[in-house]
């Protein structure tokens, strides 16, 4: 009876002692971590507007995730294989959930969001925001500039920064320990497919994250305490802030839920393809595998500097790190600021932009990773062939990406900012051009951003600068009339918001996204072959440390600095800054889209172009380089084949004896 109960209990635990069960749990962890990461990137614009901070600070917040990751990556990669890897991954998922909760906390600690406007906050009629002659200017941002320093909410973005650091700390063990766990206990021929499934999970997470971000961006940030009918802004307005905090609460819950299964997995698994006896005892092959794994783990603590020297002297490994740093600099810059670029370039809201990104870009990425893994498994592609496959696929996608330079739109036509009051475009913003003969008598503020669109198709920075004298309606339906600067036949009225860019610009957005579909598919198709070059160019005992060192270099040389320097460069293309209560600049309201486009498309293209130089040298080195991964793979396959032959011989002997009896 006791043995029976023990066997049932053992079976209950042993259901987790399978590599495929671990793969399922790890895929869920990949989904949850990529979900929260994508949601964070999608909400950066909303966070920028909520706290009134420049893009360079937003870049610091984004890079803080990598700072947290950097704090533990070498420690985890070095000691991770000695410790209980599944439990460490589970703890990491729970810590990520804690970080997401901390990010959402400022919403509950600070007051309501107050967007920049010259319109009255109530329905009471007021002439203070109209064009009125012989009036002293009463639209100063505040009487006491020290209010900005005194206000607690002006530094609330630090909570987001710290929360993102904690999220980065939690994410640290998932990839290096998860990949090394699979590499240790999966068949070598199945490893590319399993990694392809993980990469697919990393595209499902962003898909869910972008859909969640799209939904939250359409909800006003203070939905629980503000009557949205009184708002004078819409989701397409650059002052609009969506309910960014809701999604982080969802991400916190998902990350904590995905942590539970990892606490039930054993420290080691039977090597895939090696069978256990029915009573749960290990066969000789499995004992040998476990003994070898233990020896490798003891060795990694003794020979840390030996392994570091070996990795540093591995030319393909070092060149691969250089390629990854350049490619990730380009990728992080492109992906982090893509919502901002599409909003400014094509005049779309954040909700529309992130929805289109999820709809057009992520399915081909998911498909590409899956097909790439299947190709590697089906045709048993060698490392040398994988290197060539990855190189030529990346090069073809790189050349295709240059078509994006054609899919461009002009700046929003804003009088005194991008065009003259007669509608003639000019390149540079000069402050005294904000005023014209039609509004100099109005004594308007030249700093406030509360744009209106005139019947003449030209936008103005405020109703006062448009020379408007009265209004009808309330909220977003407000219409301004008798606007002296609007010279259209028979009418001189304006409505709230910037003017639309027109159908031609919308068509170019569709073409841009179609190019992105093919580009994402081709690039992701090269992902698995490229990653297998990294895994197979290092010895098995160096694998965990090698993967961790690779991730460390990417984070310190790309993940942390890239969004910071790119954000600072984007700030230099700003045409008009928002104004805080103290009169200091807040978030940027409008960019010079031509300069922004050259920066957004040009810098990543230059970085990616440079990455093909070390990639070419890798192709040259593969001709003579002896890949440890291929040697170990062939040995494992040979051993498994011999084991299968012996099992077949034993089976035949038993059958013959049964026949004789």
Swiss-Prot record:
One of its GO terms (biological process) is bile acid and bile salt transport. Disulfide bonds join 438-468, 444-464, 453-485. It is found in: Cell membrane. InterPro entries: Kazal_dom, Kazal_dom_sf, MFS_dom, MFS_trans_sf, OATP. Residues 41-59, 112-154, 224-241, 333-352, 405-512, 571-604 are extracellular. It is a multi-pass membrane protein. Optimum pH is 6.5 with estrone 3-sulfate, taurocholate, prostaglandin E2 and L-thyroxine (T4) as substrates. GO terms for molecular function: bile acid transmembrane transporter activity; organic anion transmembrane transporter activity; sodium-independent organic anion transmembrane transporter activity; transmembrane transporter activity. Keywords: Cell membrane, Disulfide bond, Glycoprotein, Ion transport, Membrane, Phosphoprotein, Transmembrane, Transmembrane helix, Transport. The modification Phosphoserine is found at residues 633-634. Highly expressed in brain, liver, and kidney but not expressed in heart, spleen, lung, skeletal muscle, and testis. It catalyses: estrone 3-sulfate(out) = estrone 3-sulfate(in); taurocholate(out) = taurocholate(in); prostaglandin E2(out) = prostaglandin E2(in); L-thyroxine(out) = L-thyroxine(in). GO terms for cellular component: basal plasma membrane; basolateral plasma membrane; membrane; plasma membrane. Glycans are attached at residues 123, 134, 443, 482, 491. Gene3D superfamilies: MFS general substrate transporter like domains (1.20.1250.20). The keyword Nucleus does not apply. Residues 1-20, 81-86, 184-202, 267-310, 377-380, 536-544, 623-661 are cytoplasmic. The chain crosses the membrane at residues 21-40, 60-80, 87-111, 155-183, 203-223, 242-266, 311-332, 353-376, 381-404, 513-535, 545-570, 605-622. Mediates the Na(+)-independent transport of organic anions such as taurocholate, cholate, 17-beta-glucuronosyl estradiol, prostaglandin E2, estrone 3-sulfate, L-thyroxine (T4), the cardiac glycosides ouabain and digoxin and thyroid hormones. May play an especially important role in the brain accumulation and toxicity of digoxin and in the hepatobiliary and renal excretion of cardiac glycosides. Shows a pH-sensitive substrate specificity which may be ascribed to the protonation state of the binding site and leads to a stimulation of substrate transport in an acidic microenvironment. Belongs to the organo anion transporter (TC 2.A.60) family. PANTHER family: ORGANIC ANION TRANSPORTER, SOLUTE CARRIER ORGANIC ANION TRANSPORTER FAMILY MEMBER 1A2. A conserved histidine residue in the third TMD (His-107) may play an essential role in the pH sensitivity of SLCO1A4/OATP1A4-mediated substrate transport. This is Solute carrier organic anion transporter family member 1A4. It comes from Rattus norvegicus.
